[in-house]
Amino acid sequence: MPLNVSFANRNYDLDYDSVQPYFYCDEEENFYQQQQQSELQPPAPSEDIWKKFELLPTPPLSPSRRSGLCSPPCVTVASFSPPGDDDGGGGSFSTADQLEMVTELLGGDMVNQSFICDPDDETFIKNIIIQDCMWSGFSAAAKLVSEKLASYQAARKDTGCPSPARGHSGCSSSSLYLQDLSPRASECIDPSVVFPYPLNDSSSPKPCASPDSTAFSPSSDSLLSSTESSPRASPEPLVLHEETPPTTSSDSEEEQEDEEEIDVVSVEKRQPSARRSESVSPPAGSHSKPPHSPLVLKRCHVSTHQHNYAAPPSTRKDCPAAKRAKLDSGRVLKQISNNRKCASPRSSDTEENDKRRTHNVLERQRRNELKRSFFALRDQIPELENNEKAPKVIILKKATAYILSVQAEEQKLISEKDLLRKRREQLKQKLEQLRNSCA
């Protein structure tokens, strides 16, 4: 922001003089030498260059989306309570409170809203923002805020001493401030048009909180609880309650504790009363919604069975579908039991090593048996009987040819046997005839 600007500075024509040494035309000057000569001159542009650009944006922006600043009347009621409200806070403004409110108003988006710069005002045309929007924006905003605070303090003094009926005086003062800001607040954009979900609770709108709780510092926990408690509620416009008294400091402290203790698990427990009222007495003409059941996380085992490509192919026939399903389920259960038995990664590593060792032993035994069977087959073939280095393919081919030759010889011998049997029968009959003739 510009240097040498304060709330007591009323001569806005001299604002440019304070920053005039920063700007120069084509004249070459030694600014650092001037600074050494004159102690009253502000620092050079290179030393304090970023402070020149800390100005408020001139064009008006949209209203703030924060829950504490979305409704200006609520903020006014919470911050300017009657003088007798010792519990609610804010009777006589201290210097710290005034500085905090002014800083919040100037730091947020509310300076650029229509309730500060009213276009219907006659002084708006002669405003110094229009005359010089580059250097006098902060001064004009400070002037407007100070005038607004002075008018509120004068209105509070006119109300007189507080009566014993503190609630009535609170309502009258709040209604007075709301009447002052109601036409300006109506010009703001309705947050329900921008947000699909309402910022307040769906069951009943809460009264505006005091500045100690959440008026100027809205927490993300409250927004989270409101959006998660009613995610399917229809968007409703924010309603300004004129007769709602400000809450006490004890209520605000309890609300702060509730908001600080919010976590992911207890978000759904924030609105028990609203859910009870909806379940007991639903409004007429509306359909009752089923209660949202909380999500339950269940543990499930993902089967990661891999095929052993090193194992020999199975020569047995395929099992039926039912038997195959039983075998698969048995494998899954066995894997689950094995996973449960593995208590630590060290034990799982030892089990894997044992399985690998047993697999290697079985594979070695299988290869040795296959080699012995080939050697036995080679010994049965006459051509390869003495050839110890005969490959397995030659052994198989010679064995096949030898088997075929042996089978052919077998058939030949069987036919010869049949002929000999017939010859025997004939000889027996002939011998019997000779015996009968001799007798």
UniProtKB/Swiss-Prot annotation:
Keyword field = Acetylation, Activator, Chromosome, Cytoplasm, DNA-binding, Glycoprotein, Isopeptide bond, Nucleus, Phosphoprotein, Proto-oncogene, Transcription, Transcription regulation, Ubl conjugation
| GO biological process assignments | chromatin remodeling; chromosome organization; DNA damage response; G1/S transition of mitotic cell cycle; intracellular iron ion homeostasis; MAPK cascade; negative regulation of cell division; negative regulation of monocyte differentiation
**Compositionally biased spans, kind Polar residues:** 335-347
Provide one Gene Ontology cellular component. cytoplasm
Tell me where in this chain the PTM Phosphoserine is found. Answer: S6, S62, S71, S81, S151, S293, S314, S329, S344, S347, S348
Q: Which residue windows does the record flag with biased composition (Basic and acidic residues)?
A: 266-278, 315-331
UniProt keyword annotation of Acyltransferase present: no
Q: Which residues are annotated as modified residue Phosphothreonine in the UniProt record?
A: T58, T315
Tell me the ranges covered by the bHLH domain, including all copies: 354-406
Q: How is it modified after translation?
A: Phosphorylated by PRKDC. Phosphorylation at Ser-329 by PIM2 leads to the stabilization of MYC. Phosphorylation at Ser-62 by CDK2 prevents Ras-induced senescence. Phosphorylated at Ser-62 by DYRK2; this primes the protein for subsequent phosphorylation by GSK3B at Thr-58. Phosphorylation at Thr-58 and Ser-62 by GSK3 is required for ubiquitination and degradation by the proteasome. Dephosphorylation at multiple sites by the PNUTS-PP1 complex promotes MYC stability by preventing ubiquitination by the SCF(FBXW7) complex.
From start to end residue, where is composition biased (Low complexity)?
Answer: 210-237
Annotated region (Disordered) at 201-360
Q: Which positions does the motif UBR5-degron occupy?
A: 355-364
Glycyl lysine isopeptide (Lys-Gly) (interchain with G-Cter in SUMO2) cross-link located where? K52, K143, K148, K298
Amino acid composition bias (Acidic residues), ranges on this chain = 251-263
Region feature (Leucine-zipper): 413-434
Task: Specify the glycosylation sites in chain numbering.
Answer: T58
Sequence motif 9aaTAD, residues: 100-108
MF terms (GO), sorted A to Z: DNA-binding transcription factor activity, RNA polymerase II-specific; E-box binding; protein dimerization activity; protein-containing complex binding
Task: Spell out which residues are annotated as carrying N6-acetyllysine.
Answer: K143, K148, K157, K317, K323, K371
Oligomer status and interactors: Efficient DNA binding requires dimerization with another bHLH protein. Binds DNA as a heterodimer with MAX. Interacts with TAF1C and SPAG9. Interacts with PARP10. Interacts with KDM5A and KDM5B. Interacts (when phosphorylated at Thr-58 and Ser-62) with FBXW7. Interacts with PIM2. Interacts with RIOX1. The heterodimer MYC:MAX interacts with ABI1; the interaction may enhance MYC:MAX transcriptional activity. Interacts with TRIM6. Interacts with NPM1; the binary complex is recruited to the promoter of MYC target genes and enhances their transcription.
The Swiss-Prot or TrEMBL note on domains reads:
The 9aaTAD motif is a transactivation domain present in a large number of yeast and animal transcription factors.
User: What is this protein's name?
Assistant: Myc proto-oncogene protein
What are the leading ranks of the lineage? Answer: Eukaryota, Metazoa, Chordata, Craniata, Vertebrata
